[in-house]
């Protein structure tokens, strides 16, 4: 997909007239355009696009839509609808009133493209630069940092589901990477019956004895598959496939290989009370996202995912708002988010403070900070 940078976009006259009539006191979107101008330009995102292919939607406009979307807590579909029907958004984007907007899928593709080209902080950093130029943020004053949970985009799995789904994910990867080799080392019909559908607790046995037996089967299959992949006669690159590595980690964390009194090999699942499990910060919870972790905050918040630490200015929180004038210059500066840091869900808030302060220092925004 190609990108042809737009020159500075002037707001169409008809859009200005209708927007001013509809919003005589303005709106967040209109204020952003009036006070901050065109915050984002297409040139800032040129590295994420090629010079050939179908023309892309303006990345500068998509960046502004993303910022407005976050401000109003909208889904992609809702944000795309706002571009098509909201007059104040058309004003902010410099669009004609008749502009139909774009499909909602464009926003997720835009975010993906930013991540793939390591431009994920470009939007936030650019916004901070503009706000600093307006004198709304800077060094000095007070800040506060607090964290909240981020739920991962994977299905929550119990230990039995995790074992079976890890084998299934590995089989899926190997069936694509080395289909001929895979048919030589497993009974395709039997394994397809066992691992064809996704492993779901709704389909699993209800009795504990049958669950224990199934856990042993999953462990035995995992060992057999890994031994085949790491065998001397197997292609060496098979062991480097991420799904194979994930299956190996799952096996080590959840199973034990021992021998019975007759010297026979026994593969059994680890028992929490007697065998122990790895600490939560090391224990994988899904074969499809090996960074997500189970965590708790307080007595009643449990989640599988990550933690995001938000730092905002709070210079005027202790001051009552006695402003009666409509003059923006007489109003105190708003509280603004100046740093976003994502960590593993198991990282305590206090452990993230040092790295957060370093990020603020690099941006020239380090203040007298305190945890909320």
Each predicted region: which residue ranges?
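Acidic, metal-coordinating catalytic cores used for nucleic-acid/nucleotide bond scission
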Residues: 53-57, 87, 370-372
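Alpha-helix capping and helix-loop boundary segments enriched in small/acidic/polar residues
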Residues: 52-56, 97-101, 344-348
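Charged, often Cys/His-bearing segments associated with DNA-binding zinc-finger transcription factors
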Residues: 1-37
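DNA-recognition alpha helix
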Residues: 79-91
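Basic, short loop/linker segments at the boundary and entry of helix-turn-helix/winged-helix-like folds
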Residues: 22-67, 71
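Polybasic low-complexity intrinsically disordered regions
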Residues: 84, 102-369
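Short, positively charged loop/turn segments that connect secondary-structure elements
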Residues: 88-106
């Amino acid at each position: 997909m190609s990108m042809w940078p737009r020159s500075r976009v002037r707001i169409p006259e008809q859009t200005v007239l209708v927007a001013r009539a509809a919003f005589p006191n303005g709106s967040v979107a209109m204020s952003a355009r009036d006070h901050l101008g065109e915050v984002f330009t297409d040139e800032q995102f040129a590295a994420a696009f090629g010079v050939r292919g179908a023309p892309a939607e303006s990345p500068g406009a998509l960046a502004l839509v993303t910022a407005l979307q976050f401000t109003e807590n909208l889904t992609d579909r809702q944000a795309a609808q706002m571009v098509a029907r909201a007059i104040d958004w058309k004003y902010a984007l410099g669009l004609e009133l008749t502009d139909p907007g774009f499909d909602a899928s464009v926003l997720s593709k835009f975010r993906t493209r930013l991540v793939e080209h390591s431009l994920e902080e470009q939007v936030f950093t650019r916004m901070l630069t503009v706000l600093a130029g307006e004198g709304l943020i800077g060094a000095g004053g007070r800040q506060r940092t607090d964290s909240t949970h981020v739920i991962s985009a994977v299905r929550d799995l119990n230990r039995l589901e995790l074992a079976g789904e890890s084998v299934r994910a590995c089989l899926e990867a190997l069936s694509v990477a080395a289909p001929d080799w895979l048919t030589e080392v497993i009974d395709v019909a039997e394994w397809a019956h066992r691992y064809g559908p996704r492993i779901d607790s709704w389909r699993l046995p209800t009795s504990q004895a049958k669950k224990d037996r199934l856990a042993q089967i999953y462990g035995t299959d995992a060992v057999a598959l890994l031994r085949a992949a790491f065998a001397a006669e197997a292609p060496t690159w098979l062991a480097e496939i991420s799904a194979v590595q994930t299956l190996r980690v799952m096996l080590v964390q959840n199973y034990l290989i021992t021998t019975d009194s007759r010297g026979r090999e026994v593969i059994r699942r680890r028992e929490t009370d007697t065998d122990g499990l790895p600490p939560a910060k090391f224990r994988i919870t899904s074969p499809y996202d090996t960074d997500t972790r189970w965590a708790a905050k307080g007595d009643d918040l449990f989640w599988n995912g990550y933690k995001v630490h938000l730092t905002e200015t709070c210079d005027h929180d202790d001051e009552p708002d006695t402003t009666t004038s409509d003059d923006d210059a007489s109003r105190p500066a708003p509280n603004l988010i100046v740093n976003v840091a994502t960590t593993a869900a198991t990282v305590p808030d206090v452990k993230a403070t040092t790295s957060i302060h370093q990020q603020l220092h690099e941006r020239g925004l380090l203040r007298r900070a305190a945890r909320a």
